[in-house]
């Protein structure tokens, strides 16, 4: 039967449905009824719904008045709650309209006064059983606990009258209605004076008092020979539920009604609540306890909280609720409560025994339903229950865990009061904190700054806590030593290392970085500007496919596979064509897909058939170490034994030229804003920016030249730092010849110098000489092949006066490039005299570059000194090279190599 709890009315039962909910509304608040015992006004019968006749009667017995004024336990709570332990059933929709009736009217529907219960406060003595001469109406037998039904049928529905007529229990119900109306009227009076909620204490006392007075109505109503129909039993269930003692509860509210805030099970109606283990079959449907703190609760409510809910159930420190009864009694909604069983104990003697049978970490919680209301900040509460519905299905099992911690620290509260179950402050400090306040989640000690409710903090991630070694463990005795536990499937978040744990030096994987820029830091122990790692970082991977390199093969550091491929492709006469756009990806797994792009990449890396092969990468390292150790010894350097075999000549073989064409740098822009007016500072700043960008391309180009990597690393860097200016001037002259026919200086597509800019830059004389160099390309009809070979030879045309570390190898490499230039000339001309004349012209052109480069060195050095005065910007790398290496050239320590006597 479907019944609205605590509202004193009965509703028809839906067909084929039985709602089983929590054991709800056992007792409700009665403080207002005692504090405001104003006159009662009869409620209009016309507006009363069916079952509204369940009201309470004011007590008139002199003995009960004396008991109310002088309670036997002497506690102040006894005076507040009135003469009985029953709590009023509040009429929520019409709290001010209360029906008054006398005991003589059977239609009043009042109930007799049950026996007095124990005090609701924690730690109060138990109420002794009622004396034998006490009124039978005060003996709370099972029948009186359930409460009778309605004998006055004027306000009852026709269906109920038919049911009662068929069952033959009309007279019995009329007798029991009077007792029920008396009971409800007394509870209505107590409702206005007390708002404390007693969980199970009053029921225990009534069970003890049941032994003092027999109940004849119980025997007659529930006897073995009873012929009451199922419909009558359903009606009994409804009345029992209205009294708060039934095992079946209504789960749906009628429209316009709200759930009471002070109901024990108010927060459990949203979904299937937690089930408390109990051996009693009739209580199998009983759910966990929960109390929500109402706004009007007094500060004296310091009862201990139970562990059944994320909310807080008070007064449960004694034994678990026990009951006995057959399945018949369970089906009829009655409860057999032994008189010897106490439902509430005030002492703390049996606290440990009460908690031994509880499983604090494996409550069967609901996986759906609305979120729980925010728990109050209470110094005695130590339960933090996470709702599994806040997580996904993967977290459901892990989330259904009860987490313990000091509630005051958990919710950031500062409430401190007397508490028997509150742990020391150090208990919360042992929590395993994985979340911080910035993440918007409460986890671990909340120390302020965190949110005080789950709604503010959001769903708490299901990470484990550290169980407090003190606090509840000292009371219940079932906690082991503190240990960090994590639910299944939860991986701990990796924390960021502290600064003391951060490794400052680079690891081995960083040392092998083969990027084009390498390490930009300077080495103060050397006299050069940039470290060798900037230009030539240590290479341990194949330059072609990225696989592990086995050595330097054919002038480049490659693996064995690329070594064999290059040998077969370079020596063979087969021509490879790319099926795509000559931009195929060549790596360890796709190096065999396109032989054409792989061969092109080999040429770009500097591989040539005539280059000297090093046996292994380790041998090169040992040779370099030997050079450093024997730099001052008269013994011959091991690296000097290396000889560079001459590049085998062949008639117009394009392999060498193909390499030079493949590695030629692309177009580089200066980033100059041509919309701004030309000025000295703007033009020179753009030139310096262009010089730094081109220097990066020069480094890449030089490293790809055949045989260049066989030089000593210090020699490689020195050659680039001394010859970069001549290389840029020579390349700019070629661009000016090919793009603007040498009429202007084509530094970059966005930076072209005409006569006006030449004057504006204050380097007109240098610009005139560079333009004259560009015109020489036209006068001599320089071919692209000749330009590429001359540019490569220009790289090896300036050295220090004291020589390089491996001067002999440098001289041999330079001679090979000179011979290549001679072969290129000979490919076009059959007459030896013509070849000699052409060779003379080209070498004279190379010699003319060196004076121009020297003038530019002097100009840039002077400009760097007074750059702060003229507001000219110098990039960092350009400024360092000019300040360190250019003075060596200007002072004569570094001199160019001329083909002809100057």
UniProtKB/Swiss-Prot annotation:
GO MF term set: androgen binding; ATPase binding; beta-catenin binding; chromatin binding; DNA binding; DNA-binding transcription activator activity, RNA polymerase II-specific; DNA-binding transcription factor activity; enzyme binding
Region (Interaction with HIPK3): 554-644
Outcome when changing residue 735 to Q: In TFM; has only 10-15% of the androgen-binding capacity of wild-type AR
Site location (Interaction with coactivator FXXLF and FXXFY motifs): 880
Domain NR LBD residue range list: 651-882
Main location: nucleus
Zinc finger (NR C4-type): 542-562, 578-602
Positions of the UniProt region annotated as Modulating: 1-540
Gene3D superfamilies: Erythroid Transcription Factor GATA-1, subunit A, Retinoid X Receptor
Region (Interaction with CCAR1) location: 574-901
Entry-linked InterPro entries: Andrgn_rcpt (IPR001103), NHR-like_dom_sf (IPR035500), Nucl_hrmn_rcpt_lig-bd (IPR000536), Nuclear_hormone_rcpt_NR3 (IPR050200), Znf_hrmn_rcpt (IPR001628), Znf_NHR/GATA (IPR013088)
PTM annotation (Phosphotyrosine): residues: 221, 265, 305, 344, 355, 360-361, 391, 517, 534, 898
Disease / disorder: Defects in Ar are a cause of androgen insensitivity. Rats with this syndrome are called testicular feminized (TFM).
Protein name, UniProt field: Androgen receptor
Organism lineage string: Eukaryota, Metazoa, Chordata, Craniata, Vertebrata
Chain's gene name: Ar
